[in-house]
Curated annotation (Swiss-Prot):
GO terms for cellular component: membrane. It is a multi-pass membrane protein. It comes from Bos taurus. The chain crosses the membrane at residues 64-84, 93-113. Disulfide bonds: none annotated. The gene is TMEM256. Pfam families: DUF423. Residues 1-29 form the signal peptide. This is Transmembrane protein 256. InterPro entries: DUF423 (IPR006696). The lineage of its organism: Eukaryota, Metazoa, Chordata, Craniata, Vertebrata. It is found in: Membrane. The keyword ATP-binding does not apply. Belongs to the TMEM256 family. Its main location: membrane.
């Protein structure tokens, strides 16, 4: 499957591999500051997996560049913000998460076009 969406398919596969690696780290190696950090990490990891799968569908939509850019940037911004908070206990970047979440929402809508 070539074309503008093929890169996002590969990015989705790499993102999924990264999500799996982070899930393993969270389950076996991470030191969380508190129970909330572990819960936040696990929820973030589920979102990471879900949106990695969405990236795999990007080549199938009519606007792959828009959908792919929105989903990739939204996943990065949303998940990185919460992974950081979960591992450090520092919530100073959490105000970026709604921006990432909004980009994810727009990415899902772009898949529907």
């Amino acid at each position: 499957m070539a074309g503008p969406g093929a890169a996002f398919r590969r990015l989705g596969a790499l993102s999924g591999a990264g999500a799996l690696g982070l899930a393993s780290y969270g389950a076996h190696g991470a030191q969380f500051p508190d129970a909330y950090g572990k819960e936040l990490f696990d929820k973030t990891n589920k979102h990471h997996f879900l949106h990695s799968l969405a990236l795999l569908a990007v080549p199938l939509c009519r606007k792959p560049l828009w959908a792919g850019l929105l989903l990739a940037s939204g996943t990065t911004l949303f998940c990185t913000t919460f992974y950081y908070q979960a591992l450090s206990g520092d919530p100073s970047f959490q105000n970026l998460a709604p921006v990432g979440g909004s980009l994810l929402l727009l990415g899902w809508l772009a898949l529907a076009l």
